């Protein structure tokens, strides 16, 4: 850390960026929490000035998530009531934040028999669920879904017709520490739920996932394990007898780790730590979450996995703004500092996730390959889509390999993470093989635009693994028609190739792209491709 100096005069009229830069100079990201009184005093002054700078821009007038807290989505209550009438309903993770609220809503809608299976068995269900006023309406089991026999006992005794599968690790940061537990819960726990739904004739099963799975590729344990679970459900929907549905949640306000942490620091008068400036989250509330879960019962169809999400998530909210509001609300003169990104939150955003040619139509939880399946419900509040196609054979092989590794108690946790990421990569590669070359080229082109990356503070090398996967999917499939369909001109294609040439690990693929460019410019007249459809030209060996 650098020594402090009085910034009051120099930064009285400074911009946000200048003040943030000064804070980071004083306490570089990655440093421990500052303890030096002089540095803390300077941080207090800088934080107060940053609050004024935000206020000057019309911010911090109200709680940043106010609009999210007041939102709701239409609940197809009549259809849901009809669906659950007389049915036994099982909720894994029933004593978590969402599970608890779901139980209350189901009771309100007339459910007469609800089963909760949760590792953390609650001690006072009557107090936790005030609507629990009918003898025997809710039964609580202390069960880890990874324990097949324990879960089987519940299915054997209770015979649930409807299952909501919510049990999972909820903290991305903790997932990077408790790797084995996170992966086994997502992989083995999900497999147990699906298998028992089929064996005991469940009618419907709804899975709660995360918007982080809209990333094509991820090395984060939390998101990668959820992607594997999504693929398991997609397979079950195609091959099983039950009807499967899925919900993608984003940041849950009532269950927000960073909001809780910031509020506690402000209440205690302590230094408030923020991961980094310019970090944004999209959020939703519990009412939206539970309505999505219940509506999924209504919109799910046999033989296909449809996932639902809130249609209008609003503008993303900056976490720094939330921290400053918490301090302002406390009435205390508290300092902030930027601790740096932690494992589970480090992955940079990949611009190719969305189709930027239609910026007003982007949905933050649906990627380019899922977007063609997007449908808005009749009420206009909810959107549904489907996963991009992938190889079931590849999934089976990767799940089998992963299961054999994670069942070995001596297998190192860090190796479990590597195996998880490698497995997800294989399934993603199979999905890209199904995808059109036009879509993959469009994703690649928009994903590594140097000027845009500079604005995000990232560089092409930060996306090496997803670039490798995209190039693998494109290899041998490019021609002029593909470039035209992707909206990529010959000059833009050449610029793309030059940008990619800076990545050492893909030089063979860059050589292929150069061959394509040369072939299309010198061998095939451009007019030929605008007058008639052409066959894909494999030019792997073109000089």
Model-derived regions: residue spans:
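Conserved Rossmann-fold NAD(P)-dependent oxidoreductase catalytic core, especially the SDR/UDP-sugar
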Residues: 165, 177-180, 184, 188-227, ...
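Phosphate-coordination loops involved in phosphoryl transfer and adenosine-cofactor binding
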Residues: 85-87, 202, 305
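NAD(P)H-binding glycine-rich loop region in Rossmannoid oxidoreductase-like domains
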Residues: 142-184, 216
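SDR active-site strand-loop-helix element
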Residues: 92, 117, 163-169, 205-211, ...
């Amino acid at each position: 850390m650098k020594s402090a100096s009085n910034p009051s005069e120099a930064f009285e009229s400074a911009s946000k960026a200048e003040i943030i830069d000064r804070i980071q100079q004083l306490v570089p990201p990655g440093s421990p929490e500052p303890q030096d009184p002089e540095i803390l005093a300077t941080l207090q002054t800088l934080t107060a000035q940053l609050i004024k700078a935000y206020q000057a821009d019309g911010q911090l007038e109200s709680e940043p998530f106010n609009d999210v807290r007041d939102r709701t989505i239409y609940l197809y209550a009549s259809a849901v009531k009809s669906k659950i009438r007389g049915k036994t309903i099982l909720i894994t993770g029933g004593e978590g934040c969402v599970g608890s609220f779901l139980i209350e809503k189901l009771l309100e809608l007339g459910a007469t028999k609800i089963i909760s299976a949760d590792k953390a068995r609650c001690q006072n269900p009557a107090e936790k669920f005030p609507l629990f006023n009918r003898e025997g309406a809710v039964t609580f089991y202390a069960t880890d879904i990874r324990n097949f026999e324990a879960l089987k006992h519940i299915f054997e005794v209770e015979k649930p017709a409807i299952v909501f599968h919510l049990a999972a690790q909820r903290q991305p940061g903790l997932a990077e520490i408790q790797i084995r537990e996170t992966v086994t819960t997502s992989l083995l726990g999900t497999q147990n739920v699906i298998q028992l739904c089929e064996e005991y004739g469940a009618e419907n099963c709804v899975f709660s996932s995360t918007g982080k799975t809209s990333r094509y590729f991820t090395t984060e344990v939390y998101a990668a394990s959820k992607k594997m679970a999504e693929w398991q459900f997609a397979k079950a929907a195609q091959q099983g007898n039950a009807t499967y549905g899925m919900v993608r949640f984003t940041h849950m306000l009532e269950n927000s780790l960073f909001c809780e942490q910031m509020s506690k620091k402000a209440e205690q008068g302590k230094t408030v730590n923020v991961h980094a400036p310019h970090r944004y989250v999209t959020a939703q509330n519990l009412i939206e979450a539970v309505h999505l879960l219940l509506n999924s019962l209504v919109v799910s169809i046999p033989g296909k996995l449809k996932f639902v999400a809130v249609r209008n998530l609003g503008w993303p909210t900056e976490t720094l703004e939330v921290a400053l509001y918490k301090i302002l609300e406390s009435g205390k003169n508290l300092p902030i500092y930027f601790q740096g990104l932690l494992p589970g939150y480090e992955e940079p955003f990949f611009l190719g996730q969305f189709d930027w040619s239609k910026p007003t139509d982007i949905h933050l939880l649906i990627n380019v390959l899922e977007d063609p399946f997007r449908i808005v419900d009749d009420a206009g509040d909810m959107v549904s889509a489907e996963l991009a196609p992938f190889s079931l054979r590849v999934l089976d092989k990767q799940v089998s390999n992963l299961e054999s590794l994670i069942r070995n108690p001596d297998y190192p946790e860090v190796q479990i993470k590597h195996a998880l990421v490698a497995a997800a990569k294989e399934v993603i590669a199979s999905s890209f093989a199904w995808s059109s070359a036009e879509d993959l080229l469009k994703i690649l082109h928009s994903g590594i635009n140097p000027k845009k990356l500079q604005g995000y503070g990232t560089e092409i090398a930060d996306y090496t693994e997803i670039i490798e996967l995209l190039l693998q999917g494109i290899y041998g499939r490019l021609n002029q028609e593909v470039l035209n369909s992707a909206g990529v001109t010959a000059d833009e294609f050449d610029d793309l190739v030059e940008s990619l040439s800076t990545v050492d690990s893909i030089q063979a693929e860059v050589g292929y792209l150069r061959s394509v460019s040369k072939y299309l410019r010198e061998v095939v007249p451009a007019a030929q491709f605008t007058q008639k459809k052409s066959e894909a030209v494999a030019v792997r060996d073109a000089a």
